[in-house]
Curated annotation (Swiss-Prot):
Biological process terms in GO annotation: translation
Keyword Cell wall biogenesis/degradation listed: no
Record's function text: One of two assembly initiator proteins, it binds directly to the 5'-end of the 23S rRNA, where it nucleates assembly of the 50S subunit.
Alphabetically ordered keywords of this record: Ribonucleoprotein, Ribosomal protein, RNA-binding, rRNA-binding
Top-level lineage group: Bacteria
GO CC terms in record: ribonucleoprotein complex; ribosome
Keyword match Isomerase: no
Protein's recorded name: Large ribosomal subunit protein uL24
Membrane spanning stretches: none
Organism field: Ruegeria pomeroyi (strain ATCC 700808 / DSM 15171 / DSS-3) (Silicibacter pomeroyi)
Length: 103
């Protein structure tokens, strides 16, 4: 199945402790059905000090399920994503406005 959410998309969190927060997708794992969104689902990771890094308690963004994310349209509202053919190219479009997300 084609990916409805991709790296670089602006999304809003629909459920969980970070409900309502907005961010940009930094990475997507389609096999696991999860994505990492910067500023969302932050956990503290304890890292050991090395010669290159100081170590300590570092915040890290953990993956969040794709079903808990919704794409933001140009109006800043959550929208579902659909696919349609434009010419010979398959493009994503916002179901609320009908605008093409990427050409």
């Amino acid at each position: 199945m084609a990916a409805k959410l991709r790296k670089g998309d602006k999304v809003v969190v629909l459920a969980g402790k970070d409900k309502g927060k907005e961010g940009t997708i930094t990475s997507v794992d389609p096999k696991a059905g999860k994505a990492v969104v910067d500023g969302v689902n932050i956990a503290i990771r304890h890292t050991r000090q090395t010669q290159t890094s100081q170590g300590g308690r570092l915040p890290k963004a953990l993956p969040i399920d794709l079903s808990n994310l919704a794409l933001l349209d140009k109006n800043g509202k959550a929208t579902r994503v659909g696919f349609r053919m434009e010419g010979d190219k398959k493009v994503r479009f916002a179901k609320t406005t009908g605008d093409v997300i990427d050409a």
